[in-house]
Structure formats: structure tokens, C-alpha cells
């Protein structure tokens, strides 16, 4: 019998990644605007309360996040030490906690970091609205990845996605209107999928 590992509630208790052990000059994310700029990932949050049947849910259902100070200090370190031009703010759903994402965007803007880097994230269409998207854009977000998974509502319901095709259409239009690029994830071969 293997018990699940205990959740780390205060993510700030975790040390910074040992990036000094890596060849940081070789890290270029494929989603960057030029594919040549130094681009790095910061893990900012863990956990997702949704029950999509295909998900691995490594970090459990409880959403926890680093403090905004920890995140903005790590962004500054990546800019100053490694020449970061782009950052991926890694979280299952960055926009899940409205207060957290508002505080984070405001902290990024207050430190002027949006003038030095641009960033990407992953989100769900049922956790954003026009005002939030505008704030994300103003804080330097240039691309949001949404997990669409399928263009079939029947298949979305089958995998318990909890979102409607109409929501994707609406939020994609809003995202595009505020000037944020969209990246969509799809799965092929969901059980019972025939076309």
C-alpha cells in the first residue's frame, strides 16, 4: 500500500529551483514569440478542484499558490541573472483564484516587470472575464493556453470537463479582443470518438 504524499500547503516553504545546476542559456520555449529568446518557467501554484476524468491531478484538488512577493522576486532574478525575456507562469489553472491573480498582476505592474518580460499561462474559460483578461494583458501576458480537449459537447460531457462549447467561443473572442494570443489544447481519440 502506498499512501499519497502529504500536500505542501505553504508553497513558499519550497526552495527555489537549483537553476545554477542547469545550462540555462539553452532554454528556449517552443511557444515563445521568436523561439530565440531566453524563456523560463516558474511554478506559481498547485492543485485543481475540477474533476476532468483524463487528468492526472498530481498536486491534488486543493489550490495553493506561492506569495506574490516570491513570484515577482523569482521573475526579477530570472531577468537579472539569466536574461529572461519571457516566462511561463505554471499552474494547472492560473486564474482559478480571482484575488490571487489580481494581486499577482498588480504586483507585476507595481514593480514594472511587464516592461521587461512577457509571460504565458494556462487557464479555463470558466475562470476568466473581460476585466481579468484586460488586467492579464496589462501585466504582460501575451498568450493563454486553454484546454479545449474536443469540439464535441458530448465528448466534453463524457470527460466531465464542466465547460460548454459556447463558453469557448465567447472567451476566445474576448481573449483575442484584448490582444492576448490563444493556444488551445485538444485530445484526439477520446473513447467513443468517431470523427
Predicted segments, located by residue:
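Glycine-rich beta-alpha loop elements in corrinoid/cobalamin-binding modules
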Residues: 1-11, 15
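Radical SAM [4Fe-4S] cluster-binding motif and immediate context
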Residues: 18-185, 190
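Active-site glycine- and acidic-residue-rich loops that bind
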Residues: 192-195
Amino acid at each position: 500500500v502506498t499512501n499519497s504524499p502529504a500536500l505542501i500547503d505553504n508553497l513558499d516553504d519550497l526552495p527555489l529551483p537549483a537553476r545554477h545546476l542547469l545550462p540555462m542559456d539553452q532554454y528556449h520555449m517552443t511557444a515563445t514569440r521568436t523561439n530565440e529568446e531566453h524563456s523560463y518557467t516558474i511554478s506559481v501554484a498547485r492543485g485543481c478542484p475540477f474533476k476532468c476524468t483524463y487528468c492526472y491531478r498530481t498536486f491534488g484538488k486543493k489550490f495553493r499558490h506561492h506569495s506574490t512577493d516570491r513570484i515577482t522576486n523569482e521573475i526579477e532574478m530570472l531577468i537579472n541573472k539569466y536574461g529572461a525575456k519571457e516566462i511561463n507562469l505554471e499552474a494547472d489553472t492560473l486564474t482559478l483564484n480571482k484575488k490571487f491573480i489580481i494581486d499577482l498582476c498588480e504586483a507585476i505592474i507595481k514593480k514594472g516587470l511587464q516592461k521587461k518580460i512577457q509571460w504565458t499561462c494556462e487557464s479555463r474559460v470558466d475562470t476568466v472575464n473581460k476585466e481579468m483578461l484586460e488586467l492579464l494583458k496589462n501585466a504582460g501576458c501575451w498568450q493563454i493556453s486553454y484546454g479545449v480537449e474536443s469540439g464535441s459537447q458530448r465528448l466534453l460531457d463524457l470527460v466531465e470537463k464542466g465547460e460548454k462549447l459556447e463558453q469557448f467561443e465567447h472567451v476566445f473572442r474576448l481573449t483575442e479582443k484584448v490582444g492576448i494570443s490563444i493556444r488551445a489544447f485538444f485530445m484526439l481519440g477520446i473513447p467513443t470518438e468517431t470523427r
